Structure formats: C-alpha cells, structure tokens
Amino acid sequence: MSDYHGPLRVGIGGPVGSGKTALMDLLCKTLRDRYQIAAITNDIYTKWDAEFLVRSGSLTQDRIVGVETGGCPHTAIREDASMNLAAVADMRAKFPDLDLVLIESGGDNLAATFSPELADLTIYVIDVAAGDKIPSKGGPGITRSDLLVINKIDLAPYVGASLDKMQIDAKRMRGERPFVMTNLKTQEGLDRIVGFIEAKGGLRAGS
C-alpha cells in the first residue's frame, strides 16, 4: 500500500482514556527500527499527547507533531481533515523515505471515523472499564474500523465486565472484520496489532 500512496497512513481513534496514546507509543517503539515512522496527534486545545510521546522517547522530536483541532475533534479527521493532511505533507517533505504515519484522533465518541483521504487503515480502541455493552452499541468505530482493539482486559474482574460477551458482541457487530483483545500495559495482544498493520498495510521492513 505504501508503494502506491506514499507512506501508509494508519488512523487510531477511540474514546478518551481508552489507550490510543499508549498504543501510539508502543507502535512507534516496536516499529521504529524496521520502518521510517512519523506520528501525528490531535488534541482540542493542547498538544499533550504529542508531548507525552516526546517525553516517552517514542520517536525523535522532529518526527512527532501535535495538531490543535479546536471544537469537535472528529471534524479534523473526517469533514475537514486539512490540518492533518497538511501535517502529513510536512512530514513527507522532511522525511521523503517515510514508510508509516500514525495519526491519533482526539478523544471522541463511537461515531468518529477517519476520512479515507486521511487514513489508509483505521484502528479503533475501546476499553473494558467503560463496560461490556460497548461493542453492542455499534457506531462506525465499532463496526467499520479495519481493526477493533478491546483494551484493558485485565480490568474486567474489577468492573464486572464479561470478556466473553464483549467478544461475542464484537463478532456479531463486525462480521469478518478482525478485533484484538489487549492489555497494552503488559503489551498483551500488541504483536497481533503489529502483524495486522504490516500484513494489511503491505509494509516490508527495509523496503
């Protein structure tokens, strides 16, 4: 995919606190020795997520940019993605050999989706602590994302959530589209997300 469209662009969305930035951090650290990567984050009035990635050492600072969206964060990834498209263009100008751009949306609801003009692949992150009914609620993030990540599975016993119910509902709502159960704190399930990005996105190390 990256051969024909420039770098592969992966959009990562999900509600506030679901684990989007943690996933961005882990993906950068896991893939940075295999591919040329840049990271773009979206926040309403701050650049907190970008600053977190810099502090964490996810990538060098020049490969991380924070977009301040103002207003509704979903607008900046869907109806008017111009700020994010400009950020991608700037990164491509700085790093012509980019293989992968990770784009994190601002925290939003289940209706948030990425414009196909902005993202080649979309990953939607939800968390068990929000309740086991979340997959059954549907919405574009649940039903249409290329990969659904159900994070914080370790919290299920503490919040009375049934992981079996979440998996059954995810299968029912998504059909053949894949989902992954994760505990990003311990990196459980991370390898499956990485494998999905590489396989579905057509990435080849050293290409």
Swiss-Prot record:
GO MF terms, alphabetically ordered: GTP binding; GTPase activity; nickel cation binding
Keyword Ion transport listed: no
GO cellular component term of the entry, any: cytoplasm
Residues at which GTP binds: G14, P15, V16, G17, S18, G19, K20, T21
InterPro entries: CobW/HypB/UreG_nucleotide-bd, P-loop_NTPase, UreG
GO biological process, one term: urea catabolic process
Main location: cytoplasm
One Pfam family of this chain: cobW
Keyword Transferase among UniProt keywords: no
Compartment list: Cytoplasm
UniProt keyword terms in alphabetical order: Chaperone, Cytoplasm, GTP-binding, Nickel insertion, Nucleotide-binding
NCBIfam families xref list: ureG
Purpose: Facilitates the functional incorporation of the urease nickel metallocenter. This process requires GTP hydrolysis, probably effectuated by UreG.
Oligomer status and interactors: Homodimer. UreD, UreF and UreG form a complex that acts as a GTP-hydrolysis-dependent molecular chaperone, activating the urease apoprotein by helping to assemble the nickel containing metallocenter of UreC. The UreE protein probably delivers the nickel.
HAMAP family: UreG
Family: Belongs to the SIMIBI class G3E GTPase family. UreG subfamily.
Protein name: Urease accessory protein UreG
Species this chain originates from: Rhodopseudomonas palustris (strain BisB18)
